[in-house]
Amino acid sequence: MHCGSTARIGPTEMKTISCSAGYGSGGLGQHLTQLVEEARGDGTLGGYFSGAPQADDESGIRVETTSSGWVFQYTPVRFSPAWKNFLGGDLLDRAVAARLTPGETFHGFNGQALHSFRRAQALGYRQLVLESATTHVDHVMRQQRKAHQLFGWEAGWMNETQRRKTLREYALADTIYVASQLSYDTFREAGVPDSKLRRRTLTVDPRFVPPAQPVGDGKFRIVYVGSVSVMKGIPLLREAFSRLTSPDAELTLVGGWGTRTMKHYLRDWQRLDPRVHIAPGDPLPHLQRADVCVHPSFTDGFGLAPAEALACGVPVIVTEDTGMKDLVQEGVNGYIVPTGDWEAILERLEQLLSKPLAMNTA
């Protein structure tokens, strides 16, 4: 069964939106931007909370949690991706709840909406809407265990405390928006009723377009865009790329690491293979020079980066547990590979190296 598309929110109800990401910053920030601009466009934006609202936007409310920064810098929390993730979202959630004023519809993101939802209920909000940027939390936990079994040297970003909080958010929400059929199916499998689920189609920033001229220098450029972690499948990409022996192949990781362990892992990788480059920052110039974008994630509710690659005319290799696989036409604009299978990634890379897809050579 495919997800429905008719929301229960009245067309004129004013929306208050909350998200930890900065406006337009990363995949989550792009998700926030889409919500804000859609509401602004139809005249229903009451305001939005963000760690970094758009500059000079009167509708944006900056939420500061810097007073708790010492927790992340000087306690054992700094060594735990899961606790850093939980506390970062929870501190913002509590700060938003403390500043929330009466309204009609409240939109929050998973893992950072429980206290805001409870406050919104007390203030008489008619609708509580949860934007799930991930698959169902139980699916995330299963995939995290799978990643840890293969590569146990970096902990995942989800812990049991975060899981319990997110399940409470599911229960309180009147409507849960998901961004892919994969996400929808994981919620159905977990027993969430169809009546509560809605599909939101995420869009790519229009600046992501094919280059005016192809590079054409004989290099085979592989690009990964996103956070550099075990859960995103970076060790799988290393296993595959290290066996791609072509001297014309090069790999660029566009993103940052979140743990010291990953930092050392990347340094070791670069020392052993000078074809590997790390380039945090804007992914657009890298995608416009790429021959393929690989997204080897163990789980992703959507995966904006490979969608941006497709918009640039670049074929993608994504896993079965990447939501944007909805957009992949096998053998036309990319390939879908089994999650956790570096050999399948290598096979597709070798195939693209010897015979590029037509979309990338037109």
Name these PLM-found stretches.
Residues F72-A82, Q127-R164:
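Acceptor-binding helix/loop patch of EC 2.4 sugar-transfer enzymes
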Residues V204-K232, R238-R243, T252:
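Conserved donor-binding/catalytic core segment of Leloir-type glycosyltransferases
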